[in-house]
């Protein structure tokens, strides 16, 4: 009896020792951190398991309006609207590495985001400059700009050509950089291909004349998450288009090869009132967006799930609408988030598209986007 008791005790002890690392491994597989901007001047980090706010990083540069993770996932770049500032943070520690403002008492800038070069030295953006003179203000044309993050100043600008300035999208258009840092892409109703050495447009890719033959008014689908990298050379996004005969609006999935400069478009179905961004799972096989139909009291919002291998819509589910919101995803692709212009984050299961819970942030989240970090 004593032998059996000792044996059972040993088995229980061994089971406990095995269970601990398994539990830790299971927790580590799903544990992550969300980073998002809040009013008036902070970045919050949120535990993506409990929803608890872990850090509140104050930005002297003001209100964050865009967030971007470097391609190597080592740095975070935030831009602010209060002082036209740039903040660089360490992605692991969330500590501020660099922070400065471009505005002066007589000069103001306005830009919404941008993209760092592979070295992390320069930051490319599109901006407008406002000069305060003795008797008036002057406003520049839209300009391509290079910001030296070490010198903390704008080192090069080139005015945007009138034909490109007139394209829909404004200075909120998405920017991407080629892997070698030699080419900047600006996604409007055309893709502007810009040489980073001269800041001159060297090519204009008309999307309706690419592999989207038979369609007109092909344009990038909106949202701060509009462009997603499925691998270092390829972007995937939602695009909208219309047939050239009765002009019915449709949407589809588009892929853009940053190296070959090749665009492919696969139509999926009729367009809704609004399509908000695209979130792609880490394995690049599944993507999610939200679609809105109707207005005000008759508004209906749905999650749409896509298989990126077959390029088909595989599932959809209605969820509670908000007047304004942004779609986000956890770093493991298991959860979807509805957030922005509110004090909370709604959590949904990505597999079932069902509501799970709401996390209270205790602060008003901006529309700067959300980064899912390990």
Give the positions of each predicted feature:
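Short coil/turn segments that connect the beta-strands within blades of beta-propeller domains
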Residues: 31-33, 72-74, 119-121, 180-182, ...
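Residue position within the beta-strands of beta-propeller blades
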Residues: 36-37, 78, 125, 186, ...
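Repeated scaffold domains used in trafficking and secretory/extracellular systems
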Residues: 62-69, 107-116, 165-176, 212-229, ...
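Short, conserved, GDST-rich strand-edge loop motifs in beta-rich repeat architectures
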Residues: 126-141, 234-248, 290-299
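An edge-strand/N-cap motif at the start of beta-rich repeat modules
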Residues: 29-55
């Amino acid at each position: 009896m004593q032998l059996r008791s000792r044996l059972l005790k040993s088995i229980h002890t061994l089971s406990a020792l095995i269970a601990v690392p398994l539990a830790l491994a299971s927790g580590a597989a799903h544990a992550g951190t969300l980073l998002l901007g809040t009013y008036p001047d902070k970045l919050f980090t949120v535990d993506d398991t409990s929803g608890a706010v872990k850090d509140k990083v104050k930005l002297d540069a003001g209100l964050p309006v865009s967030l971007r993770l470097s391609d190597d996932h080592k740095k975070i770049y935030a831009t602010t609207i209060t002082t036209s500032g740039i903040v660089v943070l360490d992605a692991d520690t969330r500590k501020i590495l660099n922070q400065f403002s471009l505005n002066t008492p007589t000069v103001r800038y306005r830009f919404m985001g941008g993209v760092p070069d592979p070295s992390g030295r320069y930051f490319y953006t599109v901006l407008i400059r406002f000069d305060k003179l003795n008797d008036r203000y002057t406003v520049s044309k839209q300009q391509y700009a290079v910001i030296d993050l070490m010198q903390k100043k704008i080192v090069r600008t080139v005015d945007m050509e009138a034909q490109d300035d007139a394209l829909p999208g404004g200075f909120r258009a998405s920017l991407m950089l080629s892997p070698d840092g030699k080419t900047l892409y600006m996604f409007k109703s055309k893709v502007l291909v810009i040489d980073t050495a001269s800041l001159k447009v060297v090519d204009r890719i008309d999307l309706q004349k690419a592999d989207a033959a038979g369609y007109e008014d092909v344009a990038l689908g909106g949202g701060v998450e509009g462009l997603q990298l499925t691998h270092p050379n390829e972007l995937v996004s939602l695009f909208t288009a219309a047939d050239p005969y009765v002009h019915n609006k449709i949407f589809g999935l588009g892929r853009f090869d940053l190296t070959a400069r090749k665009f492919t478009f696969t139509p999926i179905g009729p367009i809704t009132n609004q399509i908000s961004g695209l979130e792609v799972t880490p394995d690049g096989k599944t993507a999610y967006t939200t679609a809105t139909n109707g207005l005000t009291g008759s508004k209906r919002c749905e999650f749409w799930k896509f298989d990126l291998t077959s390029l088909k819509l595989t599932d959809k589910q209605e969820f509670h609408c908000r007047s304004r919101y942004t779609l986000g995803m956890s770093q493991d692709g298991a959860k979807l988030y509805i957030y922005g212009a509110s004090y909370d984050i709604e959590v949904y299961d990505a597999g079932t598209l069902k509501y799970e819970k709401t996390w209270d942030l205790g602060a008003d989240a901006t529309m700067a986007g959300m980064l899912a970090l390990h």
